[in-house]
Amino acid sequence: KSGAIGKPVAVDATCTSLTEIGSDPDYFRKNWNSSCAWGPTALLPVFQILGTDYKDMRIASVFADEKKTFDRFSKFDFTFDCAVATVKVGSGVKSEGELIVSGTNGYVYVPAPWWKTDYFEVRYENATENKRYFYQLNGEGIRYEIVAFVKAVENGKMTDCVSQGISREICKVVSKRERTEIKA
């Protein structure tokens, strides 16, 4: 937001965990797939940085079950007017859980696990200009925003942590993944 990296042109967010995935059909009905478990967390920085007015979205998934109702891994690709974004989520799959925001003058690198990290780096072509910033996140990092949302629902009060527009768009994207699974 400060403009330190110039204009953002790409956001890449990855969230995965080596969660044990069962093979019993009841498991798939009772547990969150990767899009439900990690989608909201991974989508949040995309929509906070680039907004929600994307022109195209494509989803590719690897499924854990024969009925293709439980995505083990999904990749979401977004095209905006002047930017792109990629979100990768996985359950029972491991990847480097980093966040990278590419800009016209440099980029922001947040190391794995970026949703819990206590620092990030602003990096440039000339490495001597790179800076590391430290900050303290509450509890489990970005997940405190989700906890704040749950408390807001319980108390019947809106929260300022995440805008309604971003919340709606996250729900829409995850729902689209779910509707796609039902059709498969």
Residue ranges and their predicted role:
Residues 128-132:
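Surface-exposed loop/edge segments in extracytoplasmic proteins
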Residues 148-184:
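C-terminal helix-rich "cap/oligomerization" subdomain common to oxidoreductases
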